[in-house]
């Protein structure tokens, strides 16, 4: 279980600060390169859209890295948000481990 209190960098922060800004890319230019509407890129940049497998494959193709990179960024954020949500943790704690005989 994650124990850090600091929220990990989200997809939007990494996308903008580590990829778009150094390359001088606008949201419109990235949207064109990705073949998606600008709204899609805007939502990614503002952490209002989660990275799915197809989006991870597209980002990896555009930036020359791996889809796992993008999915792992999303996974870290999802896990952090879940473990820091009292309602989600209460729901998880209601789950009962199975007693499976060996």
Residues covered by each model-derived region:
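DNA-binding alpha-helical recognition surfaces that contact promoter or target DNA
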Residues: 43, 57, 72
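Residues within the helices of the helix-turn-helix
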Residues: 17, 28, 57
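A short, Lys/Arg-rich alpha-helix, primarily the initiator
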Residues: 1-25, 72
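Short, basic-rich loop-to-helix N-cap that marks the start of a DNA-contacting helix
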Residues: 48-61
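Short, charged recognition helix plus adjacent turn
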Residues: 71-102
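Short alpha-helical DNA-recognition segment
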Residues: 24-43
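Residue-level detection of the helix-turn-helix DNA-binding "recognition helix"
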Residues: 35, 46, 75
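The alpha-helix within a helix-turn-helix
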Residues: 20, 31, 60
